Amino acid sequence: MLELNFSQTLGTHCLTLNETLPASGITAIFGVSGAGKTSLINAISGLTRPRKGRIVLNGRVLHDAENGICLTPEKRRIGYVFQDARLFPHYKVRGNLRYGMAKSMTGQFDKLVSLLGIEALLDRLPGSLSGGEKQRVAIGRALLTAPELLLLDEPLASLDIPRKRELLPYLQRLAREINIPMLYVSHSLDEILHLADKVMVLEDGQVKAFGPLEEVWGSSVMHPWLPKEQQSSILKVSVLEHHPHYAMTALALGDQHLWVNKLNQPLQSTLRIRIQASDVSLVLQPPQQTSIRNVLRAKVANCYDDNGQVEVQLEIGGRTLWARISPWARDELNIKPGLWLYAQVKSVSITA
């Protein structure tokens, strides 16, 4: 668990934190350039020194301004992966990995190398590696120091799209298989969508939202960040049943369910789905004899005008679902907050 309660001057703004981050999973730190993302993880790692407050990791005080405590970076047991891999060019991959390796990690070397898929790279020099391969080695080196926390500062920012796609599955595997919390700095919505368990949104050094990805993604804070074509809902669901006659799987959403193409997932397993706002239409009465398999009872929470369209925020079993309709449809159906209606979901995609 990481306790952040500090403030630090950030240009014309002040970075102010009073949050507790979880002891596992990936927490994404999101915001535009200058929002305070890198300043936050630099303060956590000990590269900078906040003028007020405390930083505590798993009960260990890393920084306490009032009592004059400020552990040096090497004493904090924190791994840091930068945008550029920063490997030693004269060491082979094996040497880079073993540099600074904790004795306690000796028995984990082969497992971690396999997890990152870098077995074939061990005897190569960094100059012969692709950008994605270098970053995998950098992540491995950071993990072999036996950190209690891993910081990743936009590790995919310098990579082209094919290399990003190459690295994402390895990061997903790490999140599932290692019991180390990770802070992942990014301004990429796609990376956050595929990796994050929780999201912290920073703006001018202030926390605008912090919580599970599903909640933050569907909040009004995140809504302006999403391009019109990406306006969507992220929902955490569980596998309810597999259809006895058709290749379809039912996913539980509160006391309702969604049908999707058959999944090779055991019953009760959890996963994350994405529904585009443009794939949701609204009706006042449950339709009869429709080809759309997913019709959900929902309550209108809010309506927002957006460049000639209307974004409708719906509540379904405590979750948020977005729909995009025309002003004509809104006016004709008299859609307003508090109205109960039915949402027809035309398409569902699985994200994680």
From Swiss-Prot:
Pfam families linked: ABC_tran, TOBE
Record's subcellular location: Cell inner membrane
Membrane topology: Peripheral membrane protein
Domain of life: Bacteria
Residue stretches making up the ABC transporter domain: 1-229
UniProt xrefs under SUPFAM superfamilies: MOP-like, P-loop containing nucleoside triphosphate hydrolases
Catalytic activity, as annotated: molybdate(out) + ATP + H2O = molybdate(in) + ADP + phosphate + H(+)
GO cellular component: plasma membrane
Domain Mop as annotated: residue spans: 289-352
InterPro entries xref list: AAA+_ATPase, ABC_transporter-like_ATP-bd, ABC_transporter-like_CS, Mo/tungstate-bd_C_term_dom, ModC_ABC_ATP-bd, Molybdenum_import_ModC, Mop_domain, P-loop_NTPase
MF term (GO), any: ATP binding
EC number: 7.3.2.5
Disulphide-bonded residues: none
Quaternary organization: The complex is composed of two ATP-binding proteins (ModC), two transmembrane proteins (ModB) and a solute-binding protein (ModA).
Family of the protein in this entry: Belongs to the ABC transporter superfamily. Molybdate importer (TC 3.A.1.8) family.
Protein's name in the database: Molybdenum import ATP-binding protein ModC
Taxonomic source organism: Salmonella typhi
Encoding gene per record: modC
